[in-house]
Amino acid sequence: ALCAVPDEITAAMLRGWHAGNGVSLGNPRLGFVCTRTTTAGDDCLEGYYLEHDRPLAPHERLRFARDERGPAFDPARAPVLASASWPPGRLEKARRNYAMAYLRTALPAAIEVLGEDEAVGVVGVAMRQVGLQHYLAACEALGLPAQGGAVQFATFLVAMARGQGDEAGVRGTRRRVVVDWPGPRLLAGDDGTPPRPAIVAMWRGLWDGALGAHDRGLVLRLAGPRRDARDGLALVVEPAG
């Protein structure tokens, strides 16, 4: 995957993240100096933060210095995060929330940049591919079978909902199963408002892909009054056709 990423993407990431850390920390004099990038063929992404003697303008917060080498890493001088003493459960929850924040940010941003129709097309396909690729590993991590009928896939969806801090339930028959997923936190707006239909459509691609890996003879659809996710989602797993 790295071979397909242009170096401009790395620069954009550094500009949007590392260059803004000084401002986020309340220190407008702090900038980032990038010395190496893997997308340019270097052996690592390397750089260091430099505190200047004056506040930096936005275009000064990131500088590239490919003729320099970053300082050697000294573990003894590195700060120790408070999470080093956290119990495993708290650490796992923090990692989960951190990962979920990426998706909560990315989906609305895709709509803002691409527009709803193109975002649903581009991101929906990407989500489907992620579901296809990682379904087996997810089942293994959850201790669930990766094959079976509608009931088995519904059980997977419920486990994923609970892993995200939500509650979900199953109803129906062996052939047609409905998963009630009240108010997915991952999709809600920052103010708790229900997600836009386009965001639900992109997110659904993840489960369409997972279902394709589980059983190509089954389909997933949204049904009932919960179609707009105001009261949560109702996901139906049933035979195709």
Model-identified regions with their sequence ranges:
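Short amphipathic alpha-helical segments
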Residues: 17-22, 207-208
